[in-house]
């Protein structure tokens, strides 16, 4: 009980600070606690698949971790845990947002953000960014609701691009070796195709020569009979 009283006192002190400096965070702080207390023990029977966009309650976390209620893209499902990339609103005041990766408009960016343009995704009312370096492992119980039209097809080039960048950020050495082997495989495949093409051309020439030889031999046999 003593530890609980200390925690309540600390939270109350923080709430008083936020009340005077950041009322919005205080409200989200409270909503997070309420959601946790209501849903902590509730069973979840959702069927969740990769590529789906949900509204999540990420809870209270340290900066720069994503906190409170935000959208998130599910990129993996393991038992009752989801692997989620948080989504937040695009803010031109932030250099990282302005330099966010986009497969068409900014394909060389090494930013930790991926630009999702509202003109390209039906579930967005305004431009947003995926936070690529803050993948979250969360319970199904953190889901508040599914975003209307919230889906990025895992077979699409955009989703596969997102997945590849995330893979490279979290497993750089493995990703580097994978890309190296992929490039080598492409080189060898191209070389094999070239050799097969040359082989086919050589076989066609050989067949033509055989026909020519057969024709000459036939003519020679005819002349020898005169």
Q: Locations of the language-model features?
A:
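C-terminal terminal-subdomain/extension
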Residues: 1-32, 102-226
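Short alpha-helix capping/helix-loop boundary micro-motifs
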Residues: 37-43
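Loop/turn positions that initiate beta-strands
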Residues: 50-51
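Structured loops at beta-to-helix junctions and adjacent beta-edge loops in soluble globular domains
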Residues: 57, 87, 133-135
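Short, charged beta-turn/beta-strand-edge "cap" motif at the junction between a beta-strand
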Residues: 59-64
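Compact nucleic-acid interaction/catalytic patches
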Residues: 65-118
């Amino acid at each position: 009980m003593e530890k609980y009283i200390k925690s309540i006192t600390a939270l109350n002190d923080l709430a008083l600070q936020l009340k005077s400096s950041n009322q919005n965070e205080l409200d989200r702080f409270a909503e997070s606690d309420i959601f946790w207390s209501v849903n902590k023990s509730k069973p979840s029977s959702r069927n969740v698949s990769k590529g789906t966009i949900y509204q999540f309650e990420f809870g209270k976390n340290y900066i720069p971790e994503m906190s409170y209620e935000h959208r998130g893209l599910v990129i993996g499902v393991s038992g009752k845990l989801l692997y989620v990339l948080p989504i937040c609103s695009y803010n031109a005041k932030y250099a990282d947002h302005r330099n966010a990766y986009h497969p068409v408009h900014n394909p060389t960016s090494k930013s930790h953000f991926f630009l999702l343009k509202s003109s390209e995704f039906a579930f967005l009312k305004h431009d947003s960014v995926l936070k690529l370096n803050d993948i979250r492992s969360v319970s199904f119980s953190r889901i508040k609701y599914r975003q209307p039209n919230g889906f990025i097809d895992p077979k699409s080039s955009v989703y596969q691009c997102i997945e590849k960048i995330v893979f490279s950020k979290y497993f750089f050495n493995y990703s580097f070796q994978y890309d190296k082997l992929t490039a080598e495989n492409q080189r060898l495949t191209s070389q094999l195709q070239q050799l097969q093409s040359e082989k086919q051309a050589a076989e066609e020439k050989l067949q033509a020569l055989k026909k020519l030889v057969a024709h000459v031999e036939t003519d020679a046999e005819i002349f020898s009979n005169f």
